[in-house]
Amino acid sequence: MPPPVLIPDARTLDGLATEVPGAVRSLAAAFWPGALTLIVKAQPTLTWDLGETRGTVALRVPDHPLALALLRRTGPLAVSSANRTGRPAATTAADAAEQLGEAIAVVLDGGPTPGNAPSTIVDATGDRLRVIRLGAIPLAELRAVADVLGPDEPREPAHDEPAAGSAEATGGADAPGDGR
């Protein structure tokens, strides 16, 4: 999964993403600013080194006045959670400074986080929108806005790929090219 990129508002979506489905725009309108991260196809002109993202970008508009003010001045920022691997996310600036120590140069203290539920992450890069992490926004609320698969629901095959378990997918006797 690509690292999250915080943006100041939904207008930034088209500058960083391509092929944005209407359902993604509906989710953004309903839940941004807020705890919704949307994974979309990245603009080919996006040349940031975000690691191996497979041509995607994860976007979120935070619901915090200090973060939004910073983003309006700086533009989009790739971020990470303020914690060490395996430790709970920091909920105060002091927690973040204690966990990250000399690995960070600056800590902005905007007060304690309003809750410790992570953002809900929706992958919009496939044929159907799919929740890949449930978080602060429940699946039912997402589904009130858009057709979204839950994290445990099976993915439907694309129109040009065989269904899982079919003879064609498993190389069974009825599969094309089996030489019989």
Indicate residue ranges for each PLM-predicted region.
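Active-site-adjacent structural elements in enzyme catalytic cores
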Residues: M1-R180
